[in-house]
Amino acid sequence: MKDLIDINNTLDLVKLKLYNEWLYTAHIYDEGNSNMHQGLTAQVVGKYIDPLNLPKDAAILDVGCGPGYFLDEMKKREYTNLTGITLSPGDIKICEEKGHKIKKYDISFFPQKDGYYDESVDFIFLRQALEHSPYPIFSLMEYNRVLKQGSKIYIEVPAPACDRKHEYNPNHYSILGQDQLMALLNRTGFKIDNFQAIEFKIGIPTVTNEDGSVKEFTEKYFCIVATKDRPLDIK
Protein backbone atom coordinates (compact mmCIF):
# COMPACT_ATOMS: atom_id res chain seq x y z
CA MET A 1 0.00 0.00 0.00
CA LYS A 2 2.83 2.40 0.89
CA ASP A 3 4.49 1.72 -2.48
CA LEU A 4 1.23 2.60 -4.24
CA ILE A 5 0.95 5.87 -2.28
CA ASP A 6 4.57 6.74 -3.14
CA ILE A 7 3.91 6.04 -6.83
CA ASN A 8 0.79 8.23 -6.81
CA ASN A 9 2.69 11.05 -5.09
CA THR A 10 5.44 10.80 -7.69
CA LEU A 11 2.90 10.90 -10.53
CA ASP A 12 1.28 13.99 -9.00
CA LEU A 13 4.66 15.75 -8.88
CA VAL A 14 5.33 14.81 -12.49
CA LYS A 15 1.94 16.21 -13.51
CA LEU A 16 2.60 19.42 -11.60
CA LYS A 17 5.96 19.80 -13.37
CA LEU A 18 4.36 19.20 -16.77
CA TYR A 19 1.54 21.67 -16.08
CA ASN A 20 4.03 24.32 -14.97
CA GLU A 21 6.22 23.77 -18.02
CA TRP A 22 3.21 24.07 -20.31
CA LEU A 23 2.09 27.32 -18.68
CA TYR A 24 5.49 28.96 -18.63
CA THR A 25 6.65 27.71 -22.01
CA ALA A 26 3.47 28.56 -23.89
CA HIS A 27 2.55 31.84 -22.25
CA ILE A 28 5.70 33.79 -21.36
CA TYR A 29 6.23 36.95 -23.38
CA ASP A 30 8.59 39.90 -23.18
CA GLU A 31 6.94 42.98 -21.73
CA GLY A 32 9.29 45.22 -23.67
CA ASN A 33 9.45 48.98 -23.34
CA SER A 34 6.25 50.91 -22.60
CA ASN A 35 6.13 54.66 -22.04
CA MET A 36 2.82 54.22 -20.21
CA HIS A 37 4.16 51.70 -17.70
CA GLN A 38 7.40 53.63 -17.29
CA GLY A 39 5.41 56.72 -16.34
CA LEU A 40 3.02 54.82 -14.08
CA THR A 41 5.92 53.14 -12.28
CA ALA A 42 7.54 56.51 -11.59
CA GLN A 43 4.23 57.75 -10.12
CA VAL A 44 3.87 54.62 -7.98
CA VAL A 45 7.36 55.00 -6.55
CA GLY A 46 6.71 58.63 -5.67
CA LYS A 47 3.30 57.96 -4.12
CA TYR A 48 3.73 54.62 -2.35
CA ILE A 49 7.42 53.71 -2.05
CA ASP A 50 9.24 56.95 -1.22
CA PRO A 51 7.10 57.52 1.92
CA LEU A 52 8.30 54.16 3.31
CA ASN A 53 11.81 55.62 3.76
CA LEU A 54 13.51 52.29 3.13
CA PRO A 55 17.20 52.13 4.07
CA LYS A 56 19.48 52.63 1.06
CA ASP A 57 21.02 49.17 1.59
CA ALA A 58 17.66 47.39 2.04
CA ALA A 59 17.40 44.03 0.25
CA ILE A 60 14.73 44.81 -2.35
CA LEU A 61 13.13 42.40 -4.83
CA ASP A 62 11.29 43.57 -7.93
CA VAL A 63 9.19 40.49 -8.67
CA GLY A 64 8.07 40.32 -12.29
CA CYS A 65 10.42 43.19 -13.09
CA GLY A 66 9.70 43.57 -16.81
CA PRO A 67 12.26 45.88 -18.46
CA GLY A 68 13.30 47.27 -15.07
CA TYR A 69 11.41 50.53 -14.61
CA PHE A 70 11.17 50.14 -10.83
CA LEU A 71 14.85 49.19 -10.65
CA ASP A 72 15.65 52.32 -12.69
CA GLU A 73 13.73 54.53 -10.26
CA MET A 74 15.35 53.00 -7.18
CA LYS A 75 18.82 53.16 -8.71
CA LYS A 76 18.28 56.90 -9.30
CA ARG A 77 17.55 57.15 -5.58
CA GLU A 78 20.87 55.43 -4.81
CA TYR A 79 19.49 52.14 -3.51
CA THR A 80 22.27 49.57 -3.65
CA ASN A 81 20.77 46.10 -3.04
CA LEU A 82 18.27 45.65 -5.88
CA THR A 83 17.32 42.40 -7.62
CA GLY A 84 14.84 41.89 -10.44
CA ILE A 85 13.02 38.59 -10.97
CA THR A 86 11.57 37.48 -14.30
CA LEU A 87 11.40 34.52 -16.67
CA SER A 88 11.37 36.67 -19.81
CA PRO A 89 14.61 36.40 -21.84
CA GLY A 90 13.99 39.73 -23.58
CA ASP A 91 13.40 41.60 -20.33
CA ILE A 92 16.45 39.96 -18.74
CA LYS A 93 18.55 41.26 -21.64
CA ILE A 94 17.17 44.81 -21.30
CA CYS A 95 17.73 44.86 -17.53
CA GLU A 96 21.25 43.46 -17.71
CA GLU A 97 22.20 46.01 -20.35
CA LYS A 98 21.15 48.68 -17.82
CA GLY A 99 23.41 47.09 -15.22
CA HIS A 100 20.66 45.60 -13.05
CA LYS A 101 21.06 42.33 -11.16
CA ILE A 102 18.47 39.86 -12.47
CA LYS A 103 17.45 36.33 -11.46
CA LYS A 104 15.56 34.00 -13.78
CA TYR A 105 13.00 32.64 -11.31
CA ASP A 106 9.34 31.76 -11.22
CA ILE A 107 7.60 34.61 -9.38
CA SER A 108 6.29 32.16 -6.76
CA PHE A 109 9.41 30.28 -5.68
CA PHE A 110 12.80 31.72 -4.70
CA PRO A 111 15.56 29.10 -4.17
CA GLN A 112 17.21 28.99 -0.77
CA LYS A 113 20.41 27.74 -2.44
CA ASP A 114 20.74 31.24 -3.94
CA GLY A 115 20.43 32.90 -0.55
CA TYR A 116 16.67 33.42 -0.31
CA TYR A 117 16.42 32.13 3.23
CA ASP A 118 13.55 32.74 5.61
CA GLU A 119 13.32 36.43 6.54
CA SER A 120 16.14 37.56 4.23
CA VAL A 121 14.37 40.34 2.28
CA ASP A 122 13.45 43.88 3.37
CA PHE A 123 10.94 44.87 0.67
CA ILE A 124 9.10 43.30 -2.26
CA PHE A 125 7.74 45.30 -5.20
CA LEU A 126 5.08 43.38 -7.12
CA ARG A 127 3.58 45.60 -9.79
CA GLN A 128 1.36 43.95 -12.43
CA ALA A 129 2.79 40.51 -11.59
CA LEU A 130 0.55 38.57 -9.19
CA GLU A 131 -2.09 38.13 -11.91
CA HIS A 132 0.50 36.04 -13.79
CA SER A 133 0.65 33.46 -10.98
CA PRO A 134 -1.51 30.34 -11.46
CA TYR A 135 -1.50 29.93 -7.65
CA PRO A 136 -1.44 33.36 -5.99
CA ILE A 137 -1.83 31.98 -2.47
CA PHE A 138 1.43 30.03 -2.92
CA SER A 139 3.09 33.20 -4.23
CA LEU A 140 1.99 35.20 -1.19
CA MET A 141 3.13 32.39 1.13
CA GLU A 142 6.59 32.56 -0.45
CA TYR A 143 6.73 36.34 -0.08
CA ASN A 144 5.82 35.92 3.58
CA ARG A 145 8.62 33.37 3.96
CA VAL A 146 11.41 35.54 2.56
CA LEU A 147 10.28 38.88 4.03
CA LYS A 148 11.60 39.93 7.41
CA GLN A 149 9.03 40.37 10.15
CA GLY A 150 7.50 43.84 9.90
CA SER A 151 8.74 44.39 6.34
CA LYS A 152 6.57 45.76 3.55
CA ILE A 153 5.26 44.59 0.21
CA TYR A 154 3.72 46.67 -2.59
CA ILE A 155 1.20 44.85 -4.77
CA GLU A 156 -0.55 46.25 -7.83
CA VAL A 157 -2.92 44.20 -9.97
CA PRO A 158 -5.60 44.85 -12.59
CA ALA A 159 -9.14 44.69 -11.27
CA PRO A 160 -11.63 42.25 -12.80
CA ALA A 161 -14.25 43.20 -15.40
CA CYS A 162 -12.35 46.17 -16.87
CA ASP A 163 -12.88 47.38 -20.44
CA ARG A 164 -9.71 45.64 -21.64
CA LYS A 165 -10.82 42.23 -20.29
CA HIS A 166 -7.59 41.31 -18.52
CA GLU A 167 -9.06 37.90 -17.76
CA TYR A 168 -8.48 36.95 -21.41
CA ASN A 169 -4.80 37.91 -21.54
CA PRO A 170 -2.98 34.63 -22.37
CA ASN A 171 -0.89 34.64 -19.19
CA HIS A 172 -3.29 36.31 -16.77
CA TYR A 173 -4.34 33.42 -14.55
CA SER A 174 -5.57 35.22 -11.42
CA ILE A 175 -7.59 38.42 -11.83
CA LEU A 176 -8.68 38.79 -8.23
CA GLY A 177 -11.51 40.90 -6.87
CA GLN A 178 -10.96 43.22 -3.92
CA ASP A 179 -12.44 40.93 -1.26
CA GLN A 180 -10.59 37.85 -2.53
CA LEU A 181 -7.29 39.73 -2.64
CA MET A 182 -7.74 41.10 0.87
CA ALA A 183 -8.70 37.64 2.16
CA LEU A 184 -5.61 36.02 0.61
CA LEU A 185 -3.33 38.65 2.12
CA ASN A 186 -4.87 38.06 5.54
CA ARG A 187 -4.55 34.28 5.24
CA THR A 188 -0.91 34.54 4.27
CA GLY A 189 0.13 36.67 7.23
CA PHE A 190 -0.10 40.22 5.90
CA LYS A 191 -1.73 43.29 7.41
CA ILE A 192 -3.04 45.75 4.83
CA ASP A 193 -1.79 49.29 5.47
CA ASN A 194 -3.23 50.93 2.37
CA PHE A 195 -5.66 49.55 -0.24
CA GLN A 196 -6.69 51.85 -3.08
CA ALA A 197 -8.71 51.23 -6.23
CA ILE A 198 -7.43 53.57 -8.95
CA GLU A 199 -9.45 54.23 -12.12
CA PHE A 200 -8.08 56.04 -15.16
CA LYS A 201 -8.53 56.30 -18.92
CA ILE A 202 -6.10 54.78 -21.37
CA GLY A 203 -5.90 55.24 -25.13
CA ILE A 204 -4.40 52.51 -27.31
CA PRO A 205 -3.11 53.90 -30.65
CA THR A 206 -3.76 50.62 -32.48
CA VAL A 207 -7.46 50.61 -31.45
CA THR A 208 -9.56 53.36 -33.04
CA ASN A 209 -13.16 54.53 -33.18
CA GLU A 210 -15.09 54.72 -36.47
CA ASP A 211 -13.97 58.33 -36.95
CA GLY A 212 -10.32 57.30 -36.66
CA SER A 213 -9.77 58.73 -33.18
CA VAL A 214 -7.96 56.65 -30.59
CA LYS A 215 -10.37 54.59 -28.53
CA GLU A 216 -10.25 55.12 -24.77
CA PHE A 217 -10.67 52.35 -22.23
CA THR A 218 -11.32 52.61 -18.50
CA GLU A 219 -8.65 50.84 -16.47
CA LYS A 220 -8.87 49.98 -12.79
CA TYR A 221 -5.93 48.87 -10.66
CA PHE A 222 -5.77 47.76 -7.04
CA CYS A 223 -2.75 49.29 -5.28
CA ILE A 224 -1.82 47.80 -1.91
CA VAL A 225 0.86 48.38 0.69
CA ALA A 226 0.95 45.61 3.29
CA THR A 227 3.15 44.56 6.20
CA LYS A 228 4.28 41.07 7.12
CA ASP A 229 2.32 40.78 10.34
CA ARG A 230 3.12 37.19 11.26
CA PRO A 231 5.10 34.23 9.92
CA LEU A 232 3.16 31.22 8.70
CA ASP A 233 3.34 28.01 10.72
CA ILE A 234 4.16 25.68 7.84
CA LYS A 235 5.98 22.49 8.79
Question: Residues of each region from the PLM?
Answer:
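Conserved N-terminal segment of class I S-adenosyl-L-methionine
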Residues: 1-117, 123, 140, 219-222, ...
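A short SAM/SAH-binding and catalytic strip from SAM-dependent methyltransferases
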Residues: 123-134
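A short glycine-rich, Lys/Arg-flanked "PGG" loop and its adjoining helix->strand segment in the class I
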Residues: 137-149
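Conserved beta-strand signature within the Rossmann-like core of class I S-adenosyl-L-methionine
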Residues: 151-157
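Short "lid" loop at the C-terminus of a central beta-strand within the Rossmann-like core
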Residues: 158-163, 175, 199-200
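Acceptor-substrate binding/catalytic loop of class I
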Residues: 165-180
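Conserved S-adenosyl-L-methionine
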Residues: 190-201
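Core SAM-dependent methyltransferase catalytic element
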Residues: 205-235
